[in-house]
């Protein structure tokens, strides 16, 4: 190996002349050729006007002496045949790519002409030419591998304008405005919700509210979720499934709606006057019940409580109240907590109450002077004792705990 490197080849100049003559000659030729090549490329790309020396450039390369050096030492611009081959391949590739672009242009399905002309501006045309030239440089020495910037790939990559069809909006983009409308319609009332194509439970009217049994907040929420699952989707584009943040917002809105409903039930049912009912036969033993009716005059309290007690049999199975041994555990509904039925004019507030056997009014055990451990079978409120003296006869002598 070392001997082969030490032996001078017959084609090499003498070792004394090599360091003196070769480096300046090599540097001069490289700079000239590179400058000419750059001017040719710039002229071809249209940046500078074409010079008359272009035709003489291949001949100038032939004046340089041929050197039979190894491929590692030789540059791309050393010999005249390589220069000529380079120029010819440039010209051929440019012409063929132009021809291909001209053929593929009218046949390929593209967008309307206005968008196509906008996409193919003069700047983009010159950019395409430069990219083709770069690709031809890469393909000179090695095998022709389709590079990402090859003319064929350029013709294919110039097709995406044809695929610029209007894409429909995603479901996430469309989900927010209909949901906002749905919330607004829910807040406006049953009429607006029905107009939007949503099945909705109507709000309780003053007469309705007395008859229907009270439902706990947790059960209301479950019912609302079930109804929301059974609702028809609103007309229009499909909605995306609500995200976690949306469900939290909806729960907050549901709580606000329930508070509004409580206000309407408590405030809206009060001014309804109801005639007093005729005296009834004594009832079965009264049980402690946490529920009542909205505040009104004494007669409306009595009638509302009787209706509530009639409908209360169905609601008691749902766990409206629980009596465990002698200790009374009270679970309140959402709108019965603030109801005022006792003559102390204080709300229910979760305290144990007893029902009058005649008028059905609910009275606090503490106001009736009754202990939790000694609840009587028949109880008559103070008003029934004053208005109906037969109450004493029906129930026997008054209980010691009664006022």
Swiss-Prot record:
Modified residue annotations for Phosphoserine: 124, 147, 150, 315-317, 400
GO molecular function, a single term: zinc ion binding
Annotated positions for site Breakpoint for translocation to form NUP98-PHF23 oncogene: 120-121
Residues the record lists as Phosphothreonine modifications: 165
Subcellular location: Nucleus; Cytoplasm
ZnF (PHD-type) residues: 339-387
Composition-biased stretches (Pro residues): 232-241, 273-287
Polar residues biased stretches: 305-318
Bias (Low complexity) ranges: 147-161
InterPro entries: Znf_FYVE_PHD (IPR011011), Znf_PHD (IPR001965), Znf_PHD-finger (IPR019787), Znf_RING/FYVE/PHD (IPR013083)
Residues modified to N-acetylmethionine: 1
Tissues showing expression: Widely expressed in human tissues and various cell lines.
Any one biological process term the GO annotation gives: autophagy
Keyword annotations: Acetylation, Autophagy, Chromosomal rearrangement, Cytoplasm, Metal-binding, Nucleus, Phosphoprotein, Ubl conjugation pathway, Zinc, Zinc-finger
Subunit description: Interacts with LRSAM1.
Function (record text): Acts as a negative regulator of autophagy, through promoting ubiquitination and degradation of LRSAM1, an E3 ubiquitin ligase that promotes autophagy in response to starvation or infecting bacteria.
Similarity-based family: Belongs to the PHF23 family.
Name of the protein: PHD finger protein 23
Source organism of this protein record: Homo sapiens (Human)
Gene field: PHF23
